[in-house]
Amino acid sequence: MNPFFKLLRVSLGHKVSFKNQISPDEWKRIYDTAKLHAVAGLLYVGIQRLPKELQPPTELMMEWFVLAKKIEQKNKFLNLRAVELTEKFRQDGFRSCILKGQGVARLYPNPYCRQSGDIDIWVEGGRKKVYRYLKGQIGQPLEMEFHHAQYPIFEDAEVEVHFIPANPQWPYSFWQVNRFTKSLEEEQFSHRVELPEGVGEIGVPTAAFDRIYSLAHIYKHFFSEGIGLRQIVDYYYILRQGFTEEERQETVKWLKRIRMYKFARAMMFVQHCVLGLEEQYLLCEPDTKEGNFLMKTIMQGGN
């Protein structure tokens, strides 16, 4: 296993031995790869667990520290914005659910090490009603696609308001995924959690929902923008929430129905053999051939 993936495993809490010191050039490659895949904050957690003699050169260590602090500060800021946005919709009569982003970051042992982007929020009410509300709030037409609209409510944080969580660009499976999300819709808008440091509550998906939704989102990236390791690590922590055998079978049933079971088996290989996810958290039997192909595709992509 190369040093990058060893460090990734250490960052995820696994015990890994480094037999040889890592050269300064190799550390630079690790840092660049971490930035490309938006996992630099997570890998900094791993670096802090290494003996001092195995850590990066001082100059790179300081650069990494500064980046990790910026990631931490942005997470804290977006947590506040997510709570503010959730409360704004609630006061105006709309229930909501934060997709990905800050909702997933809370699953990390260090919720501030995940590199965040914009705020994706699913708002109850349907496309016409929600768009009418958003347009009324801004006072002008919004940039909109079938399933979401850009909502420039903040100058310092991008917000996408989703009318439905399913993306019509998802290959093969849009209507089936939409059917799945519809079947669990009430639970998602009722599932609220407290964010770190008592900043407030947001709605987030249930584990049962996220096991399908997040994998479908990754699947869409597989055919379009490319997959980054941040998405793979997100799914690692989603799976580590655990499930009963009955819940696993229900998830597998839906994966087969929406024609993502083959992709799920490839993902289980990556989760188990690359990230070190324990067998008890795997949804199905890993597929080595498809998993190696998926891993190659991931490393050619990036966030």
Task: Go through the PLM ranges and name each one.
Residues 1-117, 122-303:
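Conserved NTP-donor binding/palm subdomain of two-metal-ion nucleotidyltransferases/polymerases, i.e.
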